[in-house]
Amino acid sequence: MAKPDIHPTWYPDAKVICNGEVVMTTGSTTPELHVDVWSGNHPFFTGTQKILDTEGRVDRFMRKYGMGSANPDVDAPAPKKAAKKSDAESDS
């Protein structure tokens, strides 16, 4: 049995507020929860996330494992030209 008068008040319909807008309700010990980010405005969940690649790590990984370039705008390096035959090989 729970001890009386030691537990916080439970609010079964606490409002979750993001940017002044009620985005959902949940149960909590406070009547309102103010959040900066939630799934409705986070880039990962909205599909607008961009890969920030400041040091070329993603491209290096893609080249290493043969997956092409992570950025389609970046051209792949040109294939190396075949070495010229030396004069000794052409005389034979």
From Swiss-Prot:
Keywords of the record: Ribonucleoprotein, Ribosomal protein, RNA-binding, rRNA-binding
SUPFAM superfamilies linked: L28p-like
Superkingdom of origin: Bacteria
GO biological process, one term: translation
GO MF terms held by the record: rRNA binding; structural constituent of ribosome
Signal peptide: none
Record bears the keyword Ribosomal protein: yes
UniProt-listed Pfam families: Ribosomal_L31
Biased composition (Low complexity): 70-80
Record's keyword annotation contains rRNA-binding: yes
Cross-referenced InterPro entries: Ribosomal_bL28/bL31-like_sf, Ribosomal_bL31, Ribosomal_bL31_A, Ribosomal_bL31_sf
Region (Disordered): 66-92
A GO cellular component entry from the record: ribosome
Family per similarity comment: Belongs to the bacterial ribosomal protein bL31 family. Type A subfamily.
Known function: Binds the 23S rRNA.
Description of how the protein assembles with itself and partners: Part of the 50S ribosomal subunit.
Name of this chain's protein: Large ribosomal subunit protein bL31
Species assigned in the record: Synechococcus sp. (strain RCC307)
Source organism phylogeny: Bacteria, Bacillati, Cyanobacteriota, Cyanophyceae, Synechococcales
